[in-house]
Amino acid sequence: MPVLTQIFQVSTLYGAATLAAAIDAGQFGAARGSRRILLVSNNSAVPETALRLAEMPGYASIAARFDSVVDWNEAISPHHPSGWGPRAEETVLWQRAFRLAWGIGPEDRVELAVESIQVNPALALAAIFSESALHVYADGLMSYGPTRNKLPGSVGCRIRRVLHLDLVAGLQPLLLTEFGVEAELVPDDAFRRVLTEISDAAGGDPQLAAVAAEAPTAVLLGQYLATLNILTADEEEHLHVRMLRGAVRAGHTSLLFKPHPTAPARYSRALERAAEEAGVRLTVLDTPLLAETLYERCAPGLVVGCFSTAMFTAAAYYGIPIAKVGTRLVLDRITPYENSNRIPLTIVDHLVPDLEQPDALAEEHTDVRVAPATLGPLVRTVGYCMQSRLHPALRPEAEAWLRDRLDATTQHYFKRRRLQSLTLPGGGPRTTAVRLRRTVRRTRSTLGF
């Protein structure tokens, strides 16, 4: 008798926790009568040397929810998960091969739960299982922004929903709305229980025990923006020092720095020197733990970052005050304009207090858990400017917002050239010379000159 096989593709522990919470909440139906496969993908630049998901505390309990676990890297070896997709004429062969290898009957129905549907490996899976329904889960602030790339209609029409965390209550995701896909919240209590489960699994970690003993009152989050070519290594090093100094000014004397797993050791050394100069205690945690585990174990009074999703999990699920440092600089630097990090940066810049400003952590400014009325229109306007072709229906609202709200306090969310190319308010007149140059370029391109 044919059965339903659900394939859950994950690449991070945070994403796996999101799926586990959705499963626990019954959002994928009952386990009876279906088979669940956890498909693990390591998307690191060099997977062979990177930390494996199975090595992280808490992974085992999450994996126990599934009937079997498959390593995607091994399945497509020697190809890289981020760079490989099947040729159109080979998709049927790949599906037959994977059904055989993974014990899926030829008549069994398959559903896919994937992250980042715009890129591989999610796109590759969607192409191989071309008749399968798709469930997209988003585990961060990017879900509030537009889809990164235009998806084939054959993929978009199969997407049933976008599962996401309620990181900013009241703010609706733009992701995949061009296909009329509805967003569905993963319940807060289910996600928090999974985070507690992961934290409990890390209880025997000696580094975590040592960190908890230091009783840090502020956590500094590193993101390694230099590897994305947004900041230089020196600039990011200085950004971390600014975080530390801001926390010290706010009265914190015991601080914890959680660097990005791939960040160079020099970042930690620079912070250690700054902590020594400031006369405060700094602990560096370089063990592979979720930031949320630190919130569970250490109960800090402040979390500082640039635009990390972990800032908002601190606020939304633990009620910890958060503060930003360097967000405006990164917002100005990221290119192209449609870079999907722009929406997380916009949200953080609009909502989160700046640690380097006086009275940044005043009581009336610290609650970022609920979206103010000003945030939704701003996000939709930025989203339209990022992907105007995907969301033409947003143009009237974007025009109205720019006419009414664009000034010195909001100009940093937009680029003049982008507004000009879309003939939106704030872009200025498109001069005859500009139009002529573009016409000449198009003509030369058409004629092959």
Give a label for each model feature.
Residues L13-A16, N43-P47, I117-P121, L141-M142, ...:
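Short acidic, S/G/P-rich loop/turn micro-motifs used as interaction or catalytic elements
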Residues S41, V70-A75, A138-L141, P216-A226, ...:
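Short loop/turn segments at strand-loop or loop-helix junctions that form parts
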Residues P47-L51, Y144-K150, I230, E292-L294, ...:
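Short, charged, surface-exposed secondary-structure boundary motifs
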Residues Y137-L228:
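A nucleotide-sugar donor-handling region in carbohydrate enzymes
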Residues A291-P336:
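A donor-sugar binding/catalytic signature common to diverse glycosyltransferases
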Residues I334-R442:
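Leloir-type glycosyltransferase catalytic cores
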